[in-house]
Amino acid sequence: MIQFQVPVVAAGLAIIFDLDGVIVDSNPVHRQAWVRYNRRQGIETDEAMLEFMYGKRNDEIVRHYFGDHLEEEEIARHGAAKEALYREMMAGEVEARLVPGVREFIQANAGRPIALASNAEPANVEFLLEASGLRRYFRVVVDGHQVRNPKPHPEVFLRAADRLGVLPADTIVFEDSHSGVLAARAAGARVVGLRTTHRDLAGTALNVEDFRSLELAAWLRNQEPLRR
């Protein structure tokens, strides 16, 4: 039973979610998957290497871990193998790793335009949305392969807003990474930070623990579209 007041955003506003660390608290599993995969390649993964991965696309991560000399096919092979390992590790864990309150929040706002905008691999996006049962609520999904420029470039959020048919300034973006916040701000969106990955995110309107936050509910009550 729901024990919190689920906030509903005002008509005329749209909601854009990142995926990892916003809908699913999956970044710890990504960390473990990279450690295991890199070890198989003879690479020991330190904390600085793991910190680099947050908010990044796989091609960036693979180049950082394995070097810029790799051919595109080899980069894709490393990325695909790691993500297959990640999905294997996440199997049966998705429901337990949903960020608290996110299911109720998405369902309560089903009448609003909702999009997902993520640097994540397409296979991971579909896996997580289908496994969580949330896919039907998203009118638009923009993954890391649909944009030329990954976060922190604003392209992914600009494309999501355009496909939803709303102004970027009338979107509320939920993010957990520094690069994601930079991208959303550059797009002109209103940004809420989730403390799942980083305790303090600069440049957000507010940072909250999860979607049950009373502070989030109060802030959303004051958000109106620029034009009615």
Language-model features: locations:
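Helix-loop "lid/cap" segments that line or gate small-molecule binding pockets
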Residues: 37-38, 57-71, 128, 161
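Anion (oxyanion) recognition and catalysis
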Residues: 39, 110, 185
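Metal-dependent phosphoesterase signature
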Residues: 44, 64-104
